[in-house]
Amino acid sequence: MATHSMIIPSPSSSSSSLATAASPFKETLPLFSRSLTFPRKSLFSQVRLRFFAEKHSQLDTSNGCATNFASLQDSGDQLTEEHVTKGESTLSITVVGASGDLAKKKIFPALFALFYEGCLPQDFSVFGYARTKLTHEELRDMISSTLTCRIDQREKCGDKMEQFLKRCFYHSGQYNSEEDFAELNKKLKEKEAGKISNRLYYLSIPPNIFVDVVRCASLRASSENGWTRVIVEKPFGRDSESSGELTRCLKQYLTEEQIFRIDHYLGKELVENLSVLRFSNLVFEPLWSRNYIRNVQLIFSEDFGTEGRGGYFDQYGIIRDIMQNHLLQILALFAMETPVSLDAEDIRSEKVKVLRSMKPLRLEDVVVGQYKGHNKGGKTYPGYTDDPTVPNHSLTPTFAAAAMFINNARWDGVPFLMKAGKALHTRGAEIRVQFRHVPGNLYKKSFATNLDNATNELVIRVQPDEGIYLRINNKVPGLGMRLDRSDLNLLYRSRYPREIPDAYERLLLDAIEGERRLFIRSDELDAAWDLFTPALKELEEKKIIPELYPYGSRGPVGAHYLASKYNVRWGDLGEA
C-alpha cells in the first residue's frame, strides 16, 4: 500500500490565542481520526475499525473528573482505506465480571464465534476481570468448557479454540480500586505493544457497581491513543429517577457516544428482520396502520422459574426485567415511522418519537401475577416464594399483562398488548399482528359465531424455532363450502440451514465497529421509564397482591379479562 501523508492545518493566530487563554486541555495536540472499511469474512456486512493517531489529552468534566479525550472523538467519521497502514492497531476487550454466568454462557462464546468467523481484528486480546482469584489457565479452562463448534457442525474447530484461548488472559481486582485498574492497564499495554489501542469494556456486573468500574477504568485504564467504549447491561435503574441518576453518574466519566446500553433482544435475528419485513415489502407497508390492524400482541414466556436467582429477580420483577425493555423496544421498532435512513441516529430518533407519543401505563391496564407451587405428572414444582433467596411474603410479580396505546395518526385506538411471565406452559417470544375483519364478510356463516377464526394474523416468532408465518383463510377441497385457516410460513431452520448467530455476537461486533443502531440512547431510555414508572410506583405503594397461577400454566385469568376489555383474544391460546 502506498504511503500517504496528511497535512494538519495550523490554527489561526486568533484561535491559537483563545486556545492558550481558555482551553480546558492540559496540553494542546493535533488530533485526527482514521478508519478502515473492508468486507467481513462472514455473513456480516463490513467491519469498521476507527483509530486516533495522536496521544490523548485530558479533559476535565464539570465535577473535576478527567475524561479520555481521545475517545470523545469516536464520532464514526471515516476517511478512506488508503490512510490506514495494515496492522497498526490492536483491540483489547475486557469482560468485567468474567467469573459470572453471563460471561461464561454468553459473552466468551460470542467472542469465540466472532473470532471463528474472522470478524475480529488480526491483533486482539481478551481480558477477564473480577474479584475471584484465577490464573490465566484457570480462566481458559472455564471458558473452554462453554465453547462449542455449533457454527459449523461439519468442521472440528479445536485448533480455532486453542488459538482463541491463547488470546485470553485474566486479572483479579476490586471493582472500586483505581490501583487494580492501573495494574490492568499495564497488562493491556504489554499486549498492545505500543500500537494504537482500541479498548472495549463489557460490564457484566450488577448496576450498583457500574459507576465505580467506569470511574476506575476511565481514570486508569482508558486508551491513550485510540477509542474506549463501554457496554452496559440492563437493568438501567429501577425507575425514571434512578435511571437518570445512573446516566448522570456515567456521563461524569464517559460521553454518550462511549456508552453502549445493550438489550440483547434487539440483536435477535427476527427482531432485526422486523424493519426489513415492513420497509422492503410493499405487501405489508400499506397495511401497517390502524386502518387494517386490529391489535398487536407482544408475548414473552419462560417455562422455568427463578431457579435460585430469586433474590436478584425480586429487586426488579417481570415488568422491569422484560416488559419495560425487551418488549417495549420491540414495540417501538414495530410502530415507528419510516426513518430518513438506516443510520443509527435516524432509527433511534424514530423510536423515541413512538415512545413520546404514548401515555404512561395506567394501573387499571395492568394485571400482575405470581406463580405458586404445583404438582404435575407426579413431579412437584416449587412456587416463587419457595425459593430460599426470596422473602416469604414477596409481592414481586413474576407475570404481567398490560395494554398500551400510541397517540398518533397511524396507531390511534389500536391496543398494543404485552404479556410476560415465568414458570408458564411454554418458552417463547413472539409478535402477533391481528388484522381487522373483511368488510361485509361474505363467508361469515362458514366460521359460525367465532369471527376470530376469520382474522388474518401475522406472527413473527423471535424464539425458539425462529420463523414468520401469515395466517390466511382458504377453502377446504371438496364439494361443500368449508373454510379453513392455513399458514404461509418461513421457518428459518428449513429455509436457512446455516446456524443463526447469537444476539450477543451481533451486538458485540456492532460495539467494536461503533455501530449504535441496536443500542439504546439516553433519551430513549428516559422516555421508556416515563411510561412505566407511575404504574410501578402505584403497584408498590398500594401493595397490590399479584394473582397466583400454577407453575406450568398459561398464567393468571386476569390477563384474559384485560384482553377482552379491548375486544382482544390472546393469539397464543390456540397453541400448545
Swiss-Prot record:
Expressed in leaves, stems, buds, flowers and siliques. Changing C157S: No effect on the interaction with G6PD4. D-glucose 6-phosphate binds at K234, H264, Y265, L266, G267, K268, E302, D321, K422, R427, Q463. Changing C149S: No effect on the interaction with G6PD4. Disulfide bonds join C149-C157. Gene3D superfamilies: Dihydrodipicolinate Reductase, domain 2, NAD(P)-binding Rossmann-like Domain. Keywords: Carbohydrate metabolism, Chloroplast, Disulfide bond, Glucose metabolism, NADP, Oxidoreductase, Peroxisome, Plastid, Transit peptide. Coiled coil: none annotated. GO terms for cellular component: chloroplast; chloroplast stroma; peroxisome. Optimum pH is 8.0. Its EC number is 1.1.1.49. It catalyses: D-glucose 6-phosphate + NADP(+) = 6-phospho-D-glucono-1,5-lactone + NADPH + H(+). NADP(+) 1 binds at G97, A98, S99, G100, D101, L102, A103, K104, R131, K234. It is found in: Plastid, Chloroplast stroma; Peroxisome. The active site is at H326. GO terms for molecular function: glucose-6-phosphate dehydrogenase activity; NADP binding. Changing K565E: Abolishes targeting to peroxisome. It is an enzyme of class 1 (oxidoreductase). PROSITE patterns: G6P_DEHYDROGENASE. GO terms for biological process: glucose metabolic process; pentose-phosphate shunt, oxidative branch. NADP(+) 2 binds at K419, R432, R461, Y469, L470, R471, R554. Forms homodimer. Interacts with G6PD2, G6PD3 and G6PD4. Belongs to the glucose-6-phosphate dehydrogenase family. Catalyzes the rate-limiting step of the oxidative pentose-phosphate pathway, which represents a route for the dissimilation of carbohydrates besides glycolysis. The main function of this enzyme is to provide reducing power (NADPH) and pentose phosphates for fatty acid and nucleic acid synthesis which are involved in membrane synthesis and cell division. There are 6 glucose-6-phosphate 1-dehydrogenase genes in A.thaliana. This is Glucose-6-phosphate 1-dehydrogenase 1, chloroplastic. It comes from Arabidopsis thaliana.
